[in-house]
A protein has these predicted regions:
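Short, solvent-exposed loop/turn segments enriched in Ser/Thr/Gly
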Residues: 282-288
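Aromatic- and acidic-residue-enriched carbohydrate-binding clefts of CAZyme catalytic domains
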Residues: 1-4, 331
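Short, well-ordered beta-strand segments enriched in hydrophobic/aromatic residues
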Residues: 288-292, 297
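Substrate-binding clefts and catalytic carboxylate motifs of secreted carbohydrate-active enzymes
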Residues: 2, 10-15, 20-47, 58-65, ...
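Short aromatic-acidic-glycine turn motif
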Residues: 220-222, 267-271, 309-328
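Acidic/polar low-complexity surface segments
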Residues: 30, 39, 46, 321-337
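Aromatic sugar-binding surface patches on proteins
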Residues: 224-233, 327-339
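Short beta-strand/loop motifs in extracellular/secreted proteins, especially
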Residues: 205-209, 242-244, 288, 303-307, ...
Length: 339
């Protein structure tokens, strides 16, 4: 599939004055000189009769070979009746509405979706001190955030369960016409004694049992409701040092586990290169993951020390980053806070 534009139908000031249809057709004709094997589309943010339920299809919806809508997956059922011969695609899906925007689609008629933006990026900040978009499920170093496992639970048949602690619920912010929540998640089990926590367990299994230092805190079923499916919420979970374990079961059998553990203080740094096959030829680029660990080699998520980085030999530091959009260190420097 080739996409030939984004929201072209919003641009009435084009010279053809037809909301992007002629431009799309010209681009498709040019594309077919090089590749006529793939279908073409344009990502649209459709007009509507009712913003929540019913679109008012733009001319581009008729012209394109695949109907691609940004965010408005709730329009698919009505437009499938209008255009029974069409294939649909959710070209931008919000990372703040994950779950419904996947489970509520008719996957026999919808190709799938692309999350915007699934990976954090510089630009489009929601306000200082953020330097860019931080609502992805992967940070800029490509480290998965807890809700990346929620996405995996939708697309993978591999049984899984993953604990995500809600650090900050916050309030919704309007951005580009959609609600963007300020909820922040973590896997940190170094906390204050007696603290009451809310958390999610992401799973594609039938049920999850939560255990704190071996004591069961209860069993909760996975909900079939698309707004709740694969995301089980727990409230008033008491903190105490030790281990918090989520056990997922399917048809009564244990199929997956995830454990959070209280760690000791950070005493060392662990370096892991992405590959050992690289050459000092001025062309190779290597990413090295630096992790703060305790005496048992466990990652210490509560460590926020300032790290100074030095390279010896035939290599130079190109950039450093900790994945935190609010961090004030420059990516072109040689120091960075652990995050």
């Amino acid at each position: 599939l080739w996409s030939l534009g984004n929201e072209l139908q919003h641009h009435a000031d084009m010279p053809f004055n037809d909301w992007g249809v002629t431009l799309y057709r010209l681009m498709r004709q040019l594309l077919h000189r090089y590749d006529h094997t793939r279908l073409t589309t344009v990502a649209m943010h459709p007009r509507y009769r009712n913003i929540d339920t019913d679109s008012l299809p733009a001319d581009l919806a008729v012209a394109t070979e695949v109907n691609s809508y940004n965010y408005r997956y709730m329009y698919f059922p009505g437009d499938m009746k209008r255009y029974p011969e069409k294939i649909f695609y959710q070209s931008e899906a919000s990372t703040e509405a994950m779950g419904p925007n996947f489970f509520e689609m008719n996957l026999d008629k919808v190709m799938g979706l692309a999350y915007w933006g699934a990976v954090d990026y510089l630009g489009e900040s929601l306000g200082w001190p953020l330097k860019g978009w931080n609502k992805g499920v992967f940070d800029m170093t490509m480290l998965p955030k807890p809700d990346a496992y929620f996405v995996k639970s939708m697309f993978s048949e591999e049984p899984l369960v993953h604990i995500a602690i809600i650090e900050k619920a916050g309030t919704d912010t309007q951005w580009n016409g959609i609600n963007v929540a300020t909820q922040r998640l973590s896997e940190n089990w170094n906390r204050n004694q007696g603290e009451q926590l809310s958390l999610y367990t992401y799973t594609n299994a039938d049920e999850v049992e939560l255990l704190l230092n071996g004591r069961s805190l209860g069993v909760k079923k996975n909900d079939a409701d698309p707004k709740l499916r694969n995301r089980i919420r727990w409230d008033a979970v008491p903190y105490e040092p030790g281990t918090l374990v989520a056990v997922a079961r399917k048809a009564g059998k244990v199929v997956a586990r995830h454990q959070l553990t209280t760690t000791g203080e950070a005493v060392a740094l662990k370096l892991k290169p992405e590959t050992t096959d690289w050459h000092a030829d001025g062309k190779d680029l290597m990413m090295v993951r630096v992790t703060a660990v305790d005496r048992k080699g466990r990652r210490v998520l509560s460590a926020h020390d300032l790290l100074h980085i030095e390279v010896k030999g035939e290599a130079d530091i190109v950039a450093v980053g900790n994945g935190d959009m609010a961090s004030s260190e420059l990516p072109v420097g040689d120091k960075q806070l652990a995050s």
